[in-house]
Amino acid sequence: MSLAFIDPMIIRSLNKSKLRKKILYLLYKMYPHGIYLSEISRRVRSDPSNVLGCLKGMNGRYNGHFSLIELGLVECVERGGVKIYKLTDYGKKIVEVLKDQDSDFIESLRW
């Protein structure tokens, strides 16, 4: 199923942050399973606080309105006291639409 329309705020959010895009593509690779914060951080090679900012928003640097969770692309599920982040079905559809446009970006990622 393809999307006829992608919210411009999603495009803006992903274009403003390579880290948001990396996290989104990592979670797409893990779909339908989730992954915890420190593992995301390790795989995208970024500080956990920056990863959390991309996922949930952070004062100043990462606007909460453009966070992956706020945009409906990622969800946080708590299992046994551990927060697991996973791509939503909507997030999966967005990535599938965008991945052809981002083929050069995807090839540059080294998991």
UniProtKB/Swiss-Prot annotation:
Q: Name one Pfam family in it.
A: EarA
Give the InterPro entries listed for this entry: ArsR-like_HTH (IPR011991), EarA-like (IPR010863), WH-like_DNA-bd_sf (IPR036388), WH_DNA-bd_sf (IPR036390)
Q: Which CDD domains does the UniProt entry name for this protein?
A: HTH_ARSR (cd00090)
TM ranges: none
The protein's name: Uncharacterized protein MJ0905
Q: Which organism is it from?
A: Methanocaldococcus jannaschii (strain ATCC 43067 / DSM 2661 / JAL-1 / JCM 10045 / NBRC 100440) (Methanococcus jannaschii)
